[in-house]
Amino acid sequence: MKCAVIYDSQTGNTRRAAEWIAEGMREAGAECGVFRIEAVDEAFVREAKGVVIGSPSYAALMTADMRAWLLSSGGKLGMGGKLGGAFATEQYTHGGGELVIQSILTNELVWGMLCYSGGAACGRPVIHIGPIGVNGNVEPHNDLENYRDYFTVYGRRFAAKAAELFGER
């Protein structure tokens, strides 16, 4: 079963988070493609059963490039019926990551995707709407590496749910 992770990244932090999600997906047995928005493999995404989309928070919103991609390209990839998910990175604690995730999930719902949240049902760590990582550039006590497990666990759970829904491994 194929799953895709699509992201925008300004400093490399969101790219790292995307790779961690893909690592978790692969641990769950999924074939995973990781794509920056400028280089999405459309054929792979069309075949994927699940797609997770991520963006850094910029002024408490997704990046302008991600918003443009969602409006121009995202809906043309046959997203309806797929399992969808979202993640974010931010430079500050409470830097808008939740808003970014909610905006991405709203786009996914408009496309007809089934949106994933393991919430509290999967136990700890509890990841309600999607993982958020804070980098250490501004807040030295926060290092993106501290959030790695949230991203890999989310990827593993996401791929397992996609396999359960679509009956594939």
Regions found by a protein language model. Name each.
Residues 2-28:
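N-terminal beta1-alpha1 ligand-phosphate binding loop
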Residues 3, 32-33, 115:
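Hydrophobic anchor at the start of a short beta-strand
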Residues 3, 10-13, 50, 74-80, ...:
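Accessory recognition modules or surfaces
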Residues 26, 71, 75, 109, ...:
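Generic secondary-structure signature for well-ordered alpha-helical cores
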Residues 30-40:
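A short, well-structured beta->alpha microelement
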Residues 38-124:
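Helix-loop-strand module that forms the ligand-binding subsite of alpha/beta enzymes
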Residues 118-169:
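Glycine-rich phosphate/pyrophosphate-binding loop and the adjoining helix
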